[in-house]
């Protein structure tokens, strides 16, 4: 008789252990979207390539959407990886693919169709859809006037959905959707008369209209709407909740408003005449002095385009001008400032630019270390214009009002008070034309934006000096352009 070991108890134990292991494994939750982002150390974002969202210039990546998302990624402690969509439909398609981007930030409006494609965050920017037409053509005043016009909009856009709804009420309305263009292209097509009308959001029009002097607003199509970020519908709520908490935080602490001011706070200072004039001067005058701007800017560690923007605000790039207050030359230097900067001939363009660059660098260096960029540049420009003493008076007024004296957004609210006795009587340096530096800075920021945009496609060399200037969509009409300078250097500008 042979002994046969009974394996049944042992098998039973093995089966029980295996079952428990499988049950425990089933109970382990897979990482949430937010946890996955943090574990990977990367936040994948998809956006559009445009001035209002994301683009690259000589200084690297920039754009309103980019900066807002970059700060969010920094808050999470992860790297931001950016992908650009070919068009709006592509953006949603990419987000809905397995392993696709987890965040979409492209100035998106929540619509019934899009709610099926993604989930939307809290809002961060209010915009108004606007019908635009070419100056000189018959101006539409209501939706009925759109019938019989050639209209092109971005394919898959909220504007296309608006027009589809209007068509139900106006059967004669026809429009085209294009996936081969961006907003800049649509505005160019209107500007050049290739199409009759297009529909764009107010923020993108404000940022781009300077490049297209012939474009005009016909009317607002509907109420203001809110832009939001999106996450893919298949994701859990963890990332969306974190996004909403972040957007609420930057709204409350003023970060969002400062970003809005940085990108949109100065875009409406230009008019048609100023735009047309700057366009001409950009091509006819700047090439003569561009090398001087670049050389002096490099020596003083200043962006040459910012220096050129200052020069345009001061003299419209004219080396022989003299104001009634005695400031002279392309950079409109006072006699005392010129002497302090080593300028022997203020009417010599090269010397004037060198002196202006040196003076601006000096003024910027004198600011408190607590002032960080980009506010440091804007406050330095204000000081360059009105004088460091008056700027300090405005900063103290801001502090007394519970505002931040290191932020241009707050200080610019106080500067006009320097012209009111109620306020300047309490300051150390007294009366000043405080409204001037506000306009001075706004104009320069706009000129600088334009110079940055028109030079960014070509990272080496100069498009201006080489005669290859390309202002998006303006080659057949006129280049970009802000208004003629409101004034020259303030007589309140101190000598060193």
UniProtKB/Swiss-Prot annotation:
Signal peptide residue numbers: 1-29
Ranges for region Disordered: 464-496
UniProt topology in membrane: Peripheral membrane protein
EC numbers, comma separated: 4.2.2.n1
An MF annotation (GO) of this entry: peptidoglycan lytic transglycosylase activity
Active site: 314
Catalytic activity: Exolytic cleavage of the (1->4)-beta-glycosidic linkage between N-acetylmuramic acid (MurNAc) and N-acetylglucosamine (GlcNAc) residues in peptidoglycan, from either the reducing or the non-reducing ends of the peptidoglycan chains, with concomitant formation of a 1,6-anhydrobond in the MurNAc residue
SUPFAM superfamilies given in the database record: Lysozyme-like, Periplasmic binding protein-like II
InterPro entries xrefs: Lysozyme-like_dom_sf, MltF, Solute-binding_3/MltF_N, Transglyc_AS, Transglycosylase_SLT_dom_1
CDD domains: MLTF-like, PBP2_YfhD_N
Family: In the N-terminal section; belongs to the bacterial solute-binding protein 3 family.
Record comment regarding domains: The N-terminal domain does not have lytic activity and probably modulates enzymatic activity. The C-terminal domain is the catalytic active domain.
Entries under NCBIfam families matching the protein: PRK10859.1
Name by which UniProt lists this protein: Membrane-bound lytic murein transglycosylase F
Organism ancestry: Bacteria, Pseudomonadati, Pseudomonadota, Gammaproteobacteria, Pseudomonadales
């Amino acid at each position: 008789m042979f002994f046969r070991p009974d394996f049944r108890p042992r098998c039973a134990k093995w089966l029980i252990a295996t079952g428990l292991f499988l049950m425990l494994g089933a109970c382990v939750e897979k990482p949430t979207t937010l946890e996955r982002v943090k574990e990977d150390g990367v936040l994948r974002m998809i956006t559009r390539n445009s001035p209002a969202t994301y683009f690259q210039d000589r200084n690297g990546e920039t754009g309103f959407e980019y900066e807002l998302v970059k700060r969010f990624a920094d808050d999470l402690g992860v790297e931001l990886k950016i992908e650009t969509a070919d068009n709006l439909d592509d953006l949603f398609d990419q987000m809905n693919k397995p392993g696709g981007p987890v965040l979409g930030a492209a100035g998106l409006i929540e619509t019934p169709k899009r709610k099926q494609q993604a989930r939307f965050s809290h809002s961060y920017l209010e915009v108004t859809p606007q019908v635009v037409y070419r100056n000189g053509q018959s101006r539409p005043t209501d939706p009925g006037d759109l019938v019989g016009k050639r209209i092109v909009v971005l394919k898959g856009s909220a504007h296309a959905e608006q027009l589809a709804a209007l068509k139900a009420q106006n059967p004669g309305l026809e429009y085209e959707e294009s996936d081969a263009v961006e907003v800049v292209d649509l505005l160019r097509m209107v500007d050049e008369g290739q199409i009759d009308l297009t529909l764009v959001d107010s923020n993108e029009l404000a940022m781009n209209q300077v490049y297209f002097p012939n474009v005009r607003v016909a009317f607002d199509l509907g109420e203001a709407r809110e832009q939001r970020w999106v996450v893919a519908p298949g994701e859990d709520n963890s990332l969306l909740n974190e996004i909403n908490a972040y957007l609420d935080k930057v709204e409350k602490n003023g970060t969002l408003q400062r970003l809005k001011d940085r990108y949109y706070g100065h875009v409406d200072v230009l008019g048609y005449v100023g735009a047309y004039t700057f366009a001409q001067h950009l091509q006819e005058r700047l090439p003569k002095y561009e090398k001087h701007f670049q050389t002096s800017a490099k020596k003083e560690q200043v962006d040459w385009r910012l220096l050129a923007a200052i020069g345009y605000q001061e003299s419209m790039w004219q080396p022989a001008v003299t104001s009634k207050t005695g400031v002279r030359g392309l950079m409109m230097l006072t006699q005392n400032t010129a002497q302090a900067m080593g300028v022997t001939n203020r009417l010599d363009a090269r010397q004037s630019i060198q002196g202006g660059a040196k003076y601006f660098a000096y003024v910027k260096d004198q600011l408190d270390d607590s002032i960080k960029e980009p506010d440091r540049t804007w406050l330095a420009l204000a000081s360059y214009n009105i004088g460091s003493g008056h700027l300090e008076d405005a900063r103290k007024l801001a502090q007394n009002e519970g505002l931040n004296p290191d932020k241009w957004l707050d200080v610019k609210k106080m500067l006009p008070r320097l012209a009111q006795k109620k306020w300047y009587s309490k300051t150390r340096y007294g009366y000043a034309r405080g409204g001037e530096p506000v306009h001075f800075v706004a104009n320069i920021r706009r000129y600088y934006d334009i110079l940055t945009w028109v030079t960014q496609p070509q990272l080496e060399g100069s498009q201006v000096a080489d005669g290859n200037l390309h202002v998006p969509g303006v080659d057949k009409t006129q280049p970009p352009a802000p208004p003629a300078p409101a004034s020259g250097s303030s007589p309140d500008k101190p000598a060193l």
